[in-house]
Amino acid sequence: MSWLKRTTGRMRRGRVVAAGNRGVDDAVTAHLTDFARTRRGVEAYVEPQTSVTQVTLLLVAYDGEWTRRVVPSPQWAHAFAESLQIPGYDAAVVGYPQRMRDYNTRNKKHPDLR
């Protein structure tokens, strides 16, 4: 019960910021841009907000290497992908590419090859 009191108390005092009102940190934008520009075959997957996570943008390169960052909205994520001229997909609709799972499996079996 104390968690509920702490949470509602924060919301009343205005400390909690709605996800849509939050800007994007320059470091996040720089990281995503750098990832997309320094790797081949990058695709963007927009992950919807859930009860435990905010909207995220997942970038996956041709070899399965990936990076994920929190973004303000699905619209922002799609506009970002379009600005970099990379394809953008809704992850809830199309799922994740097999190459990403293969990349994770390779790195678990041989972490020294990263």
Question: Each predicted region: which residue ranges?
Answer:
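Intrinsic disorder
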Residues: M1-R114
